[in-house]
Amino acid sequence: MSDIEDNDGDEYDELSELRQRHKPESQPSVDEAFDLDDLLPTIGEFGKYQKLLVFGICLPACIPCGFCAFNQLFMADTPDDYWCRIPELLDLPLEQRKSLSIPKELDNDELVYSKCYTYGVNWTQLLESGEEDDLTTMEPNASWPLIKCPQGWEYNTSVVWSSIVIDFDLVCDQDIYPTIGLAALNTGGPVGVYLFGLLNDRGGRRLSYFVCLATLLAGSLMTSLSKDFWTWAGSRVIVGLTIPAVYQIPFIISLELVGENYRSFVTVMTCTFYTSGIMLLSGVTYLERDWVRLSYITSLPFYAYFLYMFVMPESPRWLLMRGRLEEALKILERMAKVNGREFPEAVHLKLEAQIRRDKLKKQKKKMANVGLADLCRTPNMRLKTILITLSWFANETVYLGLSYYGPALGTNQYVSFFLSAVVELPSYLCCWYFMDTWGRRWPLSLSMILGGVACVITVMLPDDAVDETLVLYLVSKALLSASFLIIYPFAGELYPTQVRGIGIGASSYIGGLGLIGIPFITYLGKDNLKLPLVIMGFLSMLGGMTGLRLPETLHHRLPQTIEEGEEFGKNWQFKDCCRCAQKPEILSQPASYENLDVLAGSSTNASEVELELRDSRRVREPAPRIDERTPLDTTASGSGRPVHRPSMKRLVRQMSVMDTQRTHDGTMQLTHWI
């Protein structure tokens, strides 16, 4: 029965091909695959237009994005010393006031003034019954009862001048409230990613970005005007809705308009500028320690980004997806003009064919009805989905937890926070190199395991080893930053094209749940400074070990269907996790869509350009069995000739609207999956 179906399919394909041959030349076939990546080598992959876009819009927009994510650490800073406020004794000198009204308690084998208790006596009556000279020599009576601070606290403001902790008295029984506020910020993230993702797809990149800016500024303004904790926490949820959308949207626009050979550069530069913004935040918070003014200052740059309304282009890919051909052509023609290139006239017909084909694809996708359940339907896909999600959860949770915990270490919180950002920069560059030489699995697992070990061994240091603890923390932060950059492309390569968006979305959402819980882990450091590091260290090592079981993707053809995804890595053996990826010998360049040198030639004939843009006719070949050891380029059995995969063009483009940079053998290189 299956043979009959195969024969019918072959006859149908031959008939379809025959019809396509006899179509008029002026009517492009719906089957003709066209992508902007075909056109960019002709009109400029990274010309003047893209440079203005990246360096004038994308990268400047990334700098203050860390402000709204981490300024809360300093807005909710707790002074080192505080004690019960006794209004009746405010006229007395500080030391006399504390010695009379505050009991002492044992802390680390040292007697210190209590932070949460005072003597429960009638101070007004006591003052009226005594003489002024008696007050200077009066000592607390051991029989006086102890009560919790009934009228608030006084604070030592020598380091922390102003914070919500001081204004709202969030200490003692309410000292967990700043942690709740941090969890509220992270709660908004997954919701915002979903909402702005919908707006991004339906309303366009420009509209989504400016709505995101307006939402962030509204939340920041509410933050500054808050008069109680719960209003402040609610405003942080609104700010959290825009994290990380406010960072991702201009990044997406840039990636969609630059050529494939420059997307890795844009990705690394984006991460670098984002980290530079975090470094800048440490200086801003050092100079401005009033939390209300800090909220205003850190939101101020986002007002300037509304000027982008006059210069930020809409994504041509999104316009084509929505069938808005003329608007897309106008942007592409302007890009070619600014780059000093000629725009091929034949592209207009190709774009019309692309729009018709995309509509057919959407109809077929609706009929296919692939969902989240397909990730767990077969055993190998189910195992890989679980492992990817666990590794993602551990990676994202520990990375953010370490970022939050930096100010708590060392002798100066501003210096510690600055150093925690500085160590990310070299880790990105090292990660970029090792990903494309050692593969994805080993750099990911090794960085997470070693980073976890660096956290755990802090428990072996004495309590007074402040500098040594900080050094181990910085080593761990650098390693986790590298792994944080790897997990996105690795997951994107492991999930089959058919369910890639669903898989990445599911893993990132589950990983986002860890961001809500990690503030409560760092809260444990109030009683034991090293306990959060130990917990995050074990979680990081667990995530790194789960990554070893995943199949390597470097130099392997990526799975497209769920069936191929089930086969990929199915024959995994223990020895596979003990070796790095080996680069296969490339006998010749494959016939893939990356070989677009002809488009960059000097041909000016429109018909020639149209032929150059047209796909080569695909030849039906039996689908090979795909497993972890299947290289991208194979040779014909016994012939020694390379068997090219003419379908590579369609294979790669189905992966994402942000196609990943590849080497000449088609291997995916570093990118940031959204």
Swiss-Prot record:
GO terms for cellular component: axon terminus; plasma membrane. SUPFAM superfamilies: MFS general substrate transporter. One of its GO terms (molecular function) is neurotransmitter transmembrane transporter activity. It comes from Drosophila melanogaster (Fruit fly). This is Carcinine transporter. Residues 614-631 have a biased composition (Basic and acidic residues). Its main location: membrane. Belongs to the major facilitator (TC 2.A.1) superfamily. Organic cation transporter (TC 2.A.1.19) family.
